[in-house]
C-alpha cells in the first residue's frame, strides 16, 4: 500500500510540526524504553544485584538507538505483547544482558514512565512556541498601543480602546496558559518502579526486603531520565494516576481556548475590514469568488481548538473508569487522545506563530469606525460644554437622547452616515458651533489608560517572560497549507 491508498492523519500531513511528530513517534518511544531498561539495570547493579555486571549495562547502552524493529514486529505476531516483544528484540542484540532486561519490572515500568517522559518533551515544545507567540503579540501591542479603535461588548459598539490594548487581552490569556504549562512541568513525576499492583513486591524480593535500596533505585532512575531524584509518585496502582493525563490535556485545551478567542476576534475584525491575517501573494480565497480574502488560518485555529477542547473528555473519562489498580481500557484511548491532543496544540500554535508574525491593520478603516460611533459617545462632553454656556442640563440630556435615537434611525433605516453632530449644531438649545462640537470628537480622549496599560503589561508581565526565555523569541513558521 502507498500513502495514497490508506488513511493518514492530517496532523502528520498538514498540521503538526516534525518536532512534535517525532516526540510521539515509535522511534522516540522505543528508544526511551531502552533508556529506561539501561537505567533500571544500572540502578539495580549499583544497589548490589551481583548478577548484573558493568559489561551488561555497557552492552545495553550500546544498542539503545539501533532498534531491530523487524525482530520486535515478528515476535509480537507470535506473543501478542508489545513490551515482551521488545524485551526479546533487545536481548537478541545484547546476549550478555538478555537475562536481566526488565528485571523486577512490569510493562508499565517502560510504558508509563515513557509516557511521562514523552509528555514532558511535548510540554517543553508547546512552552517554547507559547513564548514565541507572546513575543510577536508583544511587538504588535507596543506598535499599536496608541491607535484608537472601537471596543465592543455584546458585539455592539461600546467605548474606544486601542488596537494594542486589545492585543494585550490575547497575550494575557496565553500568559495564563504558560503558567499552567509551567505548573504541569514542575509537578510532573515519574511512575518509577512499582511492580504489578504498585506494592513493589517484586523489588522487595530482589533486594531481600531492603526498602532503602528500592527507594534508591527509584531516585537513580529519575535522575538518569532527567528528573529530580525525588520526582517519583509516592504511591500508585499498576499505572500512574490517569488524572495526570487529564490535568495535562486540560492545560493544552486552555491554549485552545485562548487561541480560539484570538482567532475569532480576528475573523470578526476581518469582516469589519479593520485587521486581517497575512494573505500570501498567490493565495486563493475562493474557487468561485476571486475577490475573497477568507481568514482561513484563523478558521483553522478555531477548528483545531474545538477538537482539542473536546479531546479533554477522553482522559477525564479514562481517569474515572480505572477500576481498582488498573484496567486496560485506558490503553487504546490513551494512545490516540494524548498524542493527538499534543499534535493539535502544536498545530494551533504553529498557525498562531505564523498569523501573529504578519498581522495587518488598516488604520483608516479603524479610525472611520471609531468616528462613526464617536458622536454618541461624546454626547456627555457636548452636554457639559453646553451647560457651561448657560444650558439646562436636564433639558439638554433629553434633547441629546432624542437626537441620538433619530441619528441611529438614519444610520440603520436609511443607510446614511451618522448625522448627530449636525442635529446638535442646528439645535439652539445647545448654542454650540461646529468647531466647538468637533473639539470634543478626538478618539484619543476616550481611550482612558489603554496606552499606559499596554506599557505596564509589557514591562511587568511579558518582558520578564521574554528575558527568561530569550532563546525562544523570534521563531518563524512556514505552514504546509
Language-model-derived ranges and their functions:
Residues 211-242:
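Active-site-adjacent "gating/activation" loops or surface patches in catalytic cores
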Residues 307-393, 399:
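Long, amphipathic alpha-helical stalk/connector segments used for oligomerization, subunit docking
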Residues 276, 399-406:
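Active/binding-pocket-proximal capping segment
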Residues 142-164, 276-292, 325-332, 357-377:
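Glycine-rich cofactor-pocket loops
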Residues 21-25, 71-73, 283-303, 325-340, ...:
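Short beta-alpha connecting loops at secondary-structure transitions
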Residues 2-201, 207-222, 285-286, 296-300, ...:
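A helix-coil-helix interface module used to build multimeric assemblies
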Residues 241-274, 283-344:
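A conserved active-site cap/scaffold subdomain adjacent to cofactor or substrate pockets
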Residues 40-43, 126, 130-133, 137-140, ...:
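Amphipathic alpha-helices that form helix-helix packing interfaces
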Amino acid at each position: 500500500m502507498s500513502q495514497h491508498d490508506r488513511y493518514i492523519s492530517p496532523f502528520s500531513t498538514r498540521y503538526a510540526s516534525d518536532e512534535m511528530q517525532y516526540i510521539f513517534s515509535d522511534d522516540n518511544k522505543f528508544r526511551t524504553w531502552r533508556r529506561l531498561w539501561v537505567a533500571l539495570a544500572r540502578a539495580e547493579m549499583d544497589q548490589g544485584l551481583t548478577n548484573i555486571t558493568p559489561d551488561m549495562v555497557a552492552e545495553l547502552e550500546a544498542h539503545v538507538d539501533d532498534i531491530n524493529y523487524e525482530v520486535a514486529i515478528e515476535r509480537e505476531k507470535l506473543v501478542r505483547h508489545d513490551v515482551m516483544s521488545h524485551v526479546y528484540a533487545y536481548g537478541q542484540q545484547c546476549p550478555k544482558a538478555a537475562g536481566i532486561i526488565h528485571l523486577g519490572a512490569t510493562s508499565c515500568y517502560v510504558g508509563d514512565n515513557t509516557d511521562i517522559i514523552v509528555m514532558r518533551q511535548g510540554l517543553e515544545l508547546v512552552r517554547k512556541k507559547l513564548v514565541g507567540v507572546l513575543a510577536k503579540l508583544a511587538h504588535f501591542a507596543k506598535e499599536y498601543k496608541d491607535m484608537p479603535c472601537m471596543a465592543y461588548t455584546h458585539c455592539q459598539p461600546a467605548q474606544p480602546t486601542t488596537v494594542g490594548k486589545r492585543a494585550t487581552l490575547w497575550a494575557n490569556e496565553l500568559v495564563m496558559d504558560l503558567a499552567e504549562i509551567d505548573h504541569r512541568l514542575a509537578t510532573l513525576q515519574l511512575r518509577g518502579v512499582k511492580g504489578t499492583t504498585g506494592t513493589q513486591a517484586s523489588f522487595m524480593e530482589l533486594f531481600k526486603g531492603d526498602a532503602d535500596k528500592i527507594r534508591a533505585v527509584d531516585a537513580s532512575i529519575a535522575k538518569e531520565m532527567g528528573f529530580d531524584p525525588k520526582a517519583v509518585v509516592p504511591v500508585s496502582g499498576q499505572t500512574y494516576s490517569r488524572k495526570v493525563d487529564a490535568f495535562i490535556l486540560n492545560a493544552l485545551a486552555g491554549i485552545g481556548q485562548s487561541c480560539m478567542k484570538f482567532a475569532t476576534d480576528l475573523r470578526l475584525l476581518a469582516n469589519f475590514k479593520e485587521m486581517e491575517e497575512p494573505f500570501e501573494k498567490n493565495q486563493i480565497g475562493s474557487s468561485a469568488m476571486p475577490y475573497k480574502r477568507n481568514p482561513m488560518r484563523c478558521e483553522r485555529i478555531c477548528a483545531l481548538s474545538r477538537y482539542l477542547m473536546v479531546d479533554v473528555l477522553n482522559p477525564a473519562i479514562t481517569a474515572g473508569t480505572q477500576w481498582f489498580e488498573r484496567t486496560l481500557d485506558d490503553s487504546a484511548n490513551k494512545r490516540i487522545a494524548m498524542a493527538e491532543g499534543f499534535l493539535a496544540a502544536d498545530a494551533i500554535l504553529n498557525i498562531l506563530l505564523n498569523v501573529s508574525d504578519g498581522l495587518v491593520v488598516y488604520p483608516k478603516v479603524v479610525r472611520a469606525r471609531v468616528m462613526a460611533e464617536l458622536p454618541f459617545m461624546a454626547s456627555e462632553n457636548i452636554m457639559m460644554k453646553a451647560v457651561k454656556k448657560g444650558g439646562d442640563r436636564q433639558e439638554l440630556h433629553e434633547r441629546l437622547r432624542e437626537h441620538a435615537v433619530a441619528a441611529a434611525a438614519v444610520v440603520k433605516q436609511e443607510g446614511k452616515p451618522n448625522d448627530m453632530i449636525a442635529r446638535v449644531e442646528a439645535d439652539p438649545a445647545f448654542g454650540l458651533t461646529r468647531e466647538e462640537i468637533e473639539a470634543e470628537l478626538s478618539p484619543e480622549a476616550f481611550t482612558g489608560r489603554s496606552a499606559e496599560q499596554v506599557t505596564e503589561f509589557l514591562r511587568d508581565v511579558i518582558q520578564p517572560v521574554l528575558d527568561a526565555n530569550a532563546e525562544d523569541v523570534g521563531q518563524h513558521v512556514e505552514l504546509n497549507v
